[in-house]
């Protein structure tokens, strides 16, 4: 079982914590959020989860194997960097960071330290996308010459990101997964 802590308990944090708790592969050890009011609910429903440790204490805790970062995009790089430097496996809500150079630095550091760095691109794991990939890989559909993607749900407005980093990244992760190559 992987002992995991979650940083960020705003919009996605509660969903992630719920899913981790329901998994038989994870033990949620702690949840950290700068806003203590956000974590009061979990302290009542799951009293065994430590709440609002300081970030420094959290990454120094040797009983924690991995940390999930579910915070605003502008914080992803620094938090992930500190977690990797502390020897923790890292799960980051998409996007990994706000620039490709920062992303590459995190990837290189994770490789150097032999740690898992996972970005939460969930769509490739949905049954619909897996079925389409199966059809493409089997050549059942023939050669795919064109792929069109339409975003019909804009989600929450993100003040620290743009539509490409926040939403189009879902479509790009699906395309890369389906065709095993970068879109042009």
List each language-model region with its residue ranges:
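Beta-strand-loop-alpha-helix segment that lines the small-molecule cofactor/substrate pocket
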Residues: 66-73, 77-124
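Conserved SAM-binding strand-loop segment of SAM-dependent methyltransferases
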Residues: 48-55
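Nucleotide donor/acceptor-binding cores
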Residues: 2, 115, 142-145
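Short, Asp-centered acidic motifs that coordinate Mg2+ and/or phosphate
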Residues: 30, 66, 146
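Oxidoreductase and adenylate-handling cofactor-binding alpha/beta cores
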Residues: 125-146, 165-184
């Amino acid at each position: 079982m992987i002992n995991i802590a979650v940083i960020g308990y705003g919009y996605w944090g509660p969903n992630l914590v719920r899913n981790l708790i329901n998994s038989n592969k994870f033990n949620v050890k702690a949840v950290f959020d700068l806003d203590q009011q956000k974590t009061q609910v979990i302290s009542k429903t799951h009293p065994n989860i430590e709440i609002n440790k300081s970030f420094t204490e959290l990454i120094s805790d040797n009983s924690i194997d991995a940390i999930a970062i579910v915070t605003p995009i502008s914080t992803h790089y620094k938090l992930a960097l500190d977690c990797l430097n502390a020897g923790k496996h890292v799960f980051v809500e998409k996007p990994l960071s706000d620039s490709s150079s920062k992303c590459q630095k995190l990837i290189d550091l994770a490789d150097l330290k032999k740690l898992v760095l996972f970005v939460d691109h969930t769509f490739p794991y949905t049954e619909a996308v897996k079925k389409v990939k199966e059809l493409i890989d089997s050549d059942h559909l023939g050669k795919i010459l064109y792929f069109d993607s339409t975003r019909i749900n804009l989600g929450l407005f993100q003040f620290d990101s743009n539509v490409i980093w926040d939403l189009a990244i879902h479509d790009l992760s699906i395309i890369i997964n389906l065709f095993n190559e970068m879109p042009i």
